[in-house]
């Protein structure tokens, strides 16, 4: 390399290859690196490591606390759900009871009404039967009388008893 | 500028050596492009490989820097 | 040299990386306080502000600055745990130191007019070399000669194994190189491009708004790259550590 001969402060060639400055650069570089190394390893790195560890610890603790709170929240939710279900069941029960009561009342009323209806029906039936009876009697009377008259008109002497028996036989037959 | 053949040779040589920088650029582009192609196919694996990417780029680039250095030496140091 | 630029455009994209003494302009000895020293000091201050002052509240519910510090802690912690497993957590302070230093040095370097310590190969080589030595020593201490099984791919056919062993060995020793150049190269390239665009803006007069838009876009990209490079450096450290703890394929 030709630079070894040039040297000096003249801007000839690459300053990087100015070998006369190498010992100087190396000397100061080593000092600077040692300084940085000691600053880092004695002060900065233990401090940062401690801070990071502390933060890690805090985060872990916070996470645990959060987990606990979450569990609590889940428990509370469960209790709430249970209460809700209970209330719902109770409401159902009340509804069912009310329904049963109403049903029972309704049944009683219906029965009463049925009985009344049945009594009325029986009464009417009796009345109808009486009417029918009397109607049948009247028909018998009319038939007897008619039969007597007919016999008389035809010239016979009607025996009341025979006529009645004949009419009765006819009415039955 | 009168007929200094040696100086002309220096300059021509420096210019030729500078071509090497372009070649290194091709190399670096190749590395990065292939990395991107692979990363798009499998994005989940890409994050773990960026260190490899940079090492590859560094190796490709170092040789280009050597060419640049030769150019500098020819220009300034010979 | 490109510095003898033509056509009126004077761009010195590499000037921002020059190491110079803070006081006077004598020779740079190994103990001379330089702009590297200043910005490394700022990185230490930034780490202190973020991780010590920001977390002083020790609150369970973190303040804004405390949660940023905790996020960074948790991010790297998870990364180490995912990649290396439980055994790797012993080395978490070491990896966290690397991550925070790279991330904050990258971001500090994005302040206009600042000096970016991570753009220097000397710096990143120390970081990557330290990782390499640590991982190799750790591998042999933990596994003894069994660590060499890392290179003996037992799943490959027997004929191929010696060839694979050579390839694995080479790739093992290339690790610190790519590990360091990747970080320095990314940061350096971004800053140099910003400077080139700034040079355009200075020379275009009325039309300078076009490169200024470009600067805004590239600046945004650089913010992203700063974070990604810190992440990549850290995760590769984790991967190498995993190889040392569990060398069997």
From Swiss-Prot, chain B:
UniProt cross-references to NCBIfam families, sorted A to Z: PRK07558.1
Species of provenance: Jannaschia sp. (strain CCS1)
InterPro entries: ATP_synth_F0_csu, ATP_synth_F0_csu_sf, ATPase_proteolipid_c-like_dom, F/V-ATP_Csub_sf
Keyword Repeat set for record: no
Listed name of the protein: ATP synthase subunit c
Sites annotated Reversibly protonated during proton transport: 61
Entry's localization field: Cell inner membrane
GO molecular-function terms, A-Z: lipid binding; proton-transporting ATP synthase activity, rotational mechanism
Keyword Plastid: no
Pfam families documented for this protein: ATP-synt_C
Gene3D superfamilies (alphabetical): F1F0 ATP synthase subunit C (1.20.20.10)
SUPFAM superfamilies per UniProt: F1F0 ATP synthase subunit C
Highest taxon of source: Bacteria
Family recorded in the similarity comment: Belongs to the ATPase C chain family.
Membrane disposition: Multi-pass membrane protein
Keyword entries, A-Z: ATP synthesis, Cell inner membrane, Cell membrane, CF(0), Hydrogen ion transport, Ion transport, Lipid-binding, Membrane, Transmembrane, Transmembrane helix, Transport
Annotated Gene Ontology cellular component terms: plasma membrane; proton-transporting ATP synthase complex; proton-transporting two-sector ATPase complex, proton-transporting domain
